[in-house]
C-alpha cells in the first residue's frame, strides 16, 4: 500500500464546515463537493456530525477482503444504504456487535449497496469507525 494510502487509512475523522446560505435547498450531492484539504481535521464534538449513510469511495485497501474508506462530501462513486437490509445482515450484526467503537453513534452490521454501470449491485457491510469516516467490507 502506498504511504499516502496508509496515512489516509489511519487519519482522524474529517470535519467539513456547513454549506453556505446561498447553497441550494436540496440535499447536497456528495460527488459534487470538493475533497477536504489536509488542514480540515475534526475538532468538533461527535454529536455535531453523526455517522453518514452517504459518501464517496476514496481507495481500496488490500487484505483478506477488499476494504474501502467512505468520506462524506468528497468526489467519487457514491454508496447508499438500501431501504431493506441484506438477508445476512442480522447474522453479521450479531457477529460484529462487539467491534463497535465506544461512543460511536453508528451501529454495526448495516448493509450498503453500490450501484454499478451494469445495473448490478455490490453489497457492502458497514463496520463502525469514527463519525465521519466509515470502513466498509465489500
Swiss-Prot record:
Region of interest (Disordered), residue spans: 22-55, 81-107
Biased composition (Pro residues): 22-37
Protein name as annotated: Proline-rich protein 34
Species of provenance: Homo sapiens
Organism ancestry: Eukaryota, Metazoa, Chordata, Craniata, Vertebrata
Gene name linked to the record: PRR34
Amino acid at each position: 500500500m502506498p504511504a499516502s494510502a496508509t496515512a489516509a487509512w489511519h487519519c482522524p475523522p474529517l470535519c467539513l464546515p456547513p454549506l453556505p446560505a446561498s447553497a441550494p435547498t436540496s440535499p447536497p450531492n456528495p460527488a459534487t463537493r470538493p475533497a477536504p484539504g489536509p488542514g480540515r481535521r475534526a475538532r468538533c464534538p461527535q454529536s455535531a456530525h453523526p455517522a453518514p449513510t452517504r459518501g464517496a469511495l476514496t481507495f481500496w485497501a488490500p487484505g483478506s477482503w477488499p476494504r474501502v474508506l467512505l468520506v462524506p462530501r468528497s468526489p467519487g462513486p457514491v454508496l447508499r444504504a438500501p431501504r431493506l437490509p441484506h438477508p445476512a445482515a442480522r447474522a453479521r450484526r450479531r457477529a460484529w456487535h462487539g467491534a463497535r467503537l465506544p461512543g460511536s453513534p453508528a451501529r454495526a452490521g448495516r448493509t450498503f449497496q453500490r450501484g454499478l454501470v451494469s445495473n448490478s449491485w455490490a453489497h457492502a457491510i458497514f463496520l463502525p469507525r469514527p463519525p465521519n469516516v466509515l470502513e466498509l467490507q465489500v
